Amino acid sequence: MPFEMRGERLFKIDERIKLKNLEELSVNREHKPVRYIFALNKRIGFLDSAMGLPFVFNNRIAALEKKNYIEFFNKEKFDIIIGAGVEYSLLLGEIKKSITAKTIGWQHSTYDSYFEKRGATGYGLMKYVRKCYSALDGIWVLTNSDKREFDSNLGINSKVLYNPLPQNDGVRTTYEKGHIVFAGRLEREHKGLDYLVEVVKKILEEVPELTVDIIGDGPSNNWLKKELETAELGKIVNLVGITDNVYQFYSKASVMVQTSRWEGFGMTILEAMSCGVPVVAFHNYGPDEIIRNSVDGYLINKFDTDAFAQKVVELLKQPERKRQMGKCAIERSRDFSLEKVLPLFKRYLEEAMRGL
């Protein structure tokens, strides 16, 4: 379930909200031959044709699984169903004509990560994707850059809805000397962990008192440990793992670094900025939307680790510059507060109900 990890609830959910494990509606397709056809298509894209479209519609999601979802949605008599991410957006698009509810596809990553990267969910299936997305009553995306991509490529009119910043109870950083922080899922390709190691090595050459907190867990955890050992960085890097209080680490940081190859939004960026921590990140849709370059952080051309490290070093060596950018970061983070995002969320729901 999306609200659990290793059997533990990640978020506090109001008791009035009923949770349904969607695995109960899914069908095991592990041994179906079509599974291998779709896996091959993610590398070659041969199904993206007029002839391939019927096959995709009939086989990508099992008929029994679609039937289970249709029966469940209609039985519950929902007014609106929001599909979070590309998979559930496509599902809702397929079954739209068979359910009574209004449907919204809420995209939580970038257009290119969903559709243009080999191996991505929608890679090589763009005719199918366009048909599914155009059937929905609304598409929400995270940034204005994504809106341009989704709209121009899919022929839709999406709406931008930011992820709201979680509550920060007045936590402010003390700008501990030479201390930087990274927070995110430990996934080498996505989060650019190889670039992170490079950047830390280069910063250490200029800042001998450097210390680093790396917050998060993921499939590349062991790989990262080995890389840090090989680079002789183990003594200055603290692998925090998962924590329920990230603010205790932001409260010491002088700079946050974000090395992702792609980033749909960047909640950790906002969390750090709300504590007064300036952020250095590679240009990406999310960081570009949040960070005002040279005002509350720095945006670096992909994937220039020399320039990245140099900007971090500048901030670590210029206390007044760092503090001024930190003040601007706090100010910017308020643009993403729940008080600002929630009214837009409500308005978009109302517009979906009215067919706007």
What would you call each of these model-derived segments?
Residues 1-56, 149-151:
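N-terminal strand-loop element at the rim of the active site
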Residues 57-70, 80-100:
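An aromatic- and histidine-rich active-site surface loop
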Residues 67-74, 111, 120-139:
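Membrane-proximal helix-turn-helix segments that form the acceptor-binding/catalytic region
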Residues 102, 130-169:
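Donor nucleotide-sugar binding/catalytic pocket of nucleotide-sugar-dependent glycosyltransferases
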Residues 172-191, 197-200:
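Conserved donor-binding/catalytic core segment of Leloir-type glycosyltransferases
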Residues 242, 261:
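Aromatic "clamp/platform" in nucleotide-sugar-dependent glycosyltransferases that forms part
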Residues 278-281:
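Short hydrophobic beta-strand element within catalytic cores of glycosyltransferases
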Residues 293-294, 298-305, 314-319:
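Conserved acidic donor-binding segment of nucleotide-sugar-dependent glycosyltransferases
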